[in-house]
Amino acid sequence: MDETALPITEHLTELRGRLAWVLGAIVVGAGLSFNFAEQIFGFLLAPATAALAENGGKLQAIAPTEIFFTYIKCALLSGFVLTLPVTFWQMWSFIAPGLYDSERKAILPFVISSTGLFAGGAIFGYSTVFPIVFDFFNSWDNEWVVSAWTMKEVFSLTTRLFLAFGVAFELPLFVFFLSITGIVTAKQLFAGTPYAVLIIFVVGAMLTPPDPVSQLFLAIPMVLLYLAGATVAWIFDPERRAAKEAAAEKNVAKSD
């Protein structure tokens, strides 16, 4: 930990400079991504376009500016993702001087695990859930109604689902953090499972569109992830490990 204390104004000046670097990197990344916005858009919305293609349909733009501004949003999203290393580096450079060595060592595993879980959730949603969700929506076509999905709305829905599944997969890390900090114990986590399930379904309803299919496909993995997090918390439970070590020492003392 750096013992040199800086005035609050210097901290704010440094923070402003680092935010400028992050925003500049995002703008550059978005500018480069705009050249490939059509390809990026096509990849992100492949599950939706595949569902529409089954009935011979395709995405529509109902406003003169819709295609252009949707591609800009797509480029900004891509620029944000591509420049995440710059964002993390600037965050680290800002907070590292105020951390102890033990805290610095814990940051890297935390960043790696949280990034991996978020990416895993996004990939799971994209590859497994998105096709089912869009097929479900498209299945309501009939002789009186034909689906006419706009690219703006489908892009918005897709990004919301990406965010929902990415955040949902952070649940084991959050549960583990609560355990190792002593806020809750593994026993309390397992005992509170019914309440956790209720909260998960409420959160799932808030993060997803108002249909039961996408809510279920988000809530069920979240319940499993909660139980996985509680299991990991049980394995690393400080009280359990301390009791186990005390019992081992007692057995050694008896054998002597």
Regions found by a protein language model. Give the residues of each.
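Membrane topogenic/interface segments and analogous intrinsically disordered interaction regions
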Residues: 1-256
